Amino acid sequence: MQNVLTQRLTNDEQQKTLKTLIEKNLEIKTMNKFDIENLDLYYGENQALKAINLPIPVRQVTALIGPSGCGKSTLLRCLNRMNDLIEGVKITGKLAMDGEDIYGNVDVADLRIKVGMVFQKPNPFPMSIYENVAYGLRAQGIKDKKHIDEVVERSLRGAALWDEVKDRLKSHAFGLSGGQQQRLCIARTIAMEPDVILMDEPTSALDPIATHKIEELMEELKKNYTIVIVTHSMQQARRISDRTAFFLMGELVEHNDTQVIFSEPSDDRTRGYVNGDFG
């Protein structure tokens, strides 16, 4: 009798644990990393973003698409306050990360560690492969060589680059191919353990083979990071993203699951853009 009761309790505990895990998994899937509400941005008198309302889900790839000058890169730079570096910029509205307004009383340097960025053109530092990845750690005052070695290897593995460079870590980063340099920049970013990785057209300067490797890498990275990517390639947005937001002349026309945006958009402007009628 006691064994039966014990077994029942064990089963009940297992069911309870399973329920908790399912609830947490659902919470991760439905949580937003960013909540953008009524966001306006001005460059002097010119309004570049107009009343943007956009949730960005956690641990998914969100693609920002639209013709040149539509505001997608401007919005991307809002997510880690890179626009602060531009004179005359004015921002109103709310942009919250994990519920905290990032334009409130926050440490901007800390924000930019949590929200890393990979730019259009690979920009490795003029130093060795190893030192590129270790640079941010050293800048934070970390001196433990064993710890730095571990982070460098882990980050290069995370960027799918370790096997290609492990025997030449002391070689200059400029000796890498363009695709390898871009993956090195991704490794440098994830070495700082961010929550979010922003990518501003990260494959536009790369050949198709290097582009494919970056896209494969993004599929792995989203298991641990929230990714927001600006892309001019409709095919790329369709391949890699979970959510897509379409911008036109500073306005967010619509956002939805990527499959919906490309197959059943609700706005004729979106339909025209994804069908190649303009752009």
UniProtKB/Swiss-Prot annotation:
Catalytic reactions of this protein: phosphate(out) + ATP + H2O = ADP + 2 phosphate(in) + H(+)
GO cellular component: plasma membrane
Domain ABC transporter: from-to ranges: 34-274
Entry annotated with the keyword Nucleus: no
SUPFAM superfamilies: P-loop containing nucleoside triphosphate hydrolases
One GO term of the biological process aspect: phosphate ion transmembrane transport
UniProt keyword list: ATP-binding, Cell inner membrane, Cell membrane, Membrane, Nucleotide-binding, Phosphate transport, Translocase, Transport
Gene Ontology terms, MF aspect: ATP binding; ATP hydrolysis activity; ATPase-coupled phosphate ion transmembrane transporter activity
Gene3D superfamilies: P-loop containing nucleotide triphosphate hydrolases
Enzyme class per UniProt: translocase
Membrane topology: Peripheral membrane protein
Entry's localization field: Cell inner membrane
EC number: 7.3.2.1
Record-linked Pfam families: ABC_tran
Residue numbers binding ATP: 66-73
PANTHER family: ABC TRANSPORTER I FAMILY MEMBER 17
Protein family: Belongs to the ABC transporter superfamily. Phosphate importer (TC 3.A.1.7) family.
Purpose: Part of the ABC transporter complex PstSACB involved in phosphate import. Responsible for energy coupling to the transport system.
NCBIfam families per UniProt: 3a0107s01c2 (TIGR00972)
Assembly: The complex is composed of two ATP-binding proteins (PstB), two transmembrane proteins (PstC and PstA) and a solute-binding protein (PstS).
The protein's name in its UniProt record: Phosphate import ATP-binding protein PstB 2
Gene name linked to the record: pstB2
